[in-house]
Curated annotation (Swiss-Prot):
Its EC number is 2.4.1.180. It catalyses: UDP-N-acetyl-alpha-D-mannosaminouronate + N-acetyl-alpha-D-glucosaminyl-di-trans,octa-cis-undecaprenyl diphosphate = beta-D-ManNAcA-(1->4)-alpha-D-GlcNAc-di-trans,octa-cis-undecaprenyl diphosphate + UDP + H(+). Belongs to the glycosyltransferase 26 family. One of its GO terms (biological process) is enterobacterial common antigen biosynthetic process. This is UDP-N-acetyl-D-mannosaminuronic acid transferase. GO terms for molecular function: lipopolysaccharide N-acetylmannosaminouronosyltransferase activity. Catalyzes the synthesis of Und-PP-GlcNAc-ManNAcA (Lipid II), the second lipid-linked intermediate involved in enterobacterial common antigen (ECA) synthesis. Pathway: Bacterial outer membrane biogenesis; enterobacterial common antigen biosynthesis. It is an enzyme of class 2 (transferase). Keywords: Glycosyltransferase, Transferase. HAMAP family: WecG_RffM. Pfam families: Glyco_tran_WecG (PF03808).
């Protein structure tokens, strides 16, 4: 078996993470032996680690997800500190989603998109079809009522979707994916937050050099000073990291 089809796991504060070496490893793992894995993908960064710590419901939700991976550079550094031999790298959720969509287009994998504003969702669909010929079997923007959820789950099931990506923000998207899987279990689910906005150019992502240096958080802070309260909250995570309380 190709070594890329398996991956070690690492534990941070009780949360088990998949250790992917790079993007290619992630893709080979998810498409092991030509068979797309089923389950839920959840990106983990320092902010989400704090939420998990403080919110028992969110912790239960995320613990139940099969594929938790290091999306934030702080989490990667913590894994490397706790496990010095770990060959783990950051796999950004936005990049992983694009690579999954490109692979889906190549292989004809059926995709259902959920979330986002109606116009952003429409632009996302059009770009996915034009760029990678993605087989989109259905979509639903994020503006639906709670009483419409069950009908949406049934629609997703009837579509036969093999990949369902949900852009609703945490923890709403994790709750949605958990509940939808009760109706349509045989698919790979991925929570993607604001990825559709980035993909369609409505939100600018940090330049590559900032990403490479692990400073995407600083770029976002400089672009959106209102994030300062969220960033200050991360000092608690840094304390865990530097005191070895991982």
């Amino acid at each position: 078996m190709n070594n890329n089809t398996t991956a070690p796991t690492y534990t941070l504060r009780g949360l088990q993470l998949i250790g992917w070496r790079d993007m290619q490893h992630a893709l080979d793992y998810l498409f092991a032996d030509g068979q797309l894995k089923q389950g839920t993908l959840v990106a983990i960064n320092a902010e989400k680690m704090l939420t998990i710590e403080d919110n028992a419901e969110v912790r239960e939700l995320i613990n139940a997800a099969e594929f938790k991976y290091a999306d934030g550079i702080s989490v990667v550094r913590s894994v490397r500190k706790k496990y010095p031999q770990a060959q783990v790298s950051r796999v950004a959720g936005a990049d992983l989603w694009e690579e999954l969509m490109a692979r889906a287009g190549k292989e004809g994998t059926q995709v259902f998109l959920v979330g986002g504003k109606p116009e952003v969702l429409a632009q996302t669909e059009a770009k996915l079809r034009n760029q990678w010929n993605v087989n989109i079997v259905g979509s639903q923007d994020g503006y639906f009522k709670p009483e419409q959820r069950q009908a949406l789950f049934e629609r997703i099931h009837a579509s036969g979707a093999q990949i369902v990506t949900v852009a609703m923000g945490a923890p709403k998207q994790e709750i949605f994916m958990r509940d939808c899987r009760l109706v349509h279990p045989d698919a790979l689910y991925m929570g993607v937050g604001g990825t559709y906005d980035v993909f369609t150019g409505h939100v600018k992502r940090a330049p590559k050099i900032w990403q490479t240096l692990g400073l995407e958080w600083l770029y976002r802070l400089l672009s959106q000073p209102s994030r300062i309260k969220r960033q200050l909250r991360l000092l608690r995570y840094l304390r865990w990291h530097y005191t070895g309380n991982l």
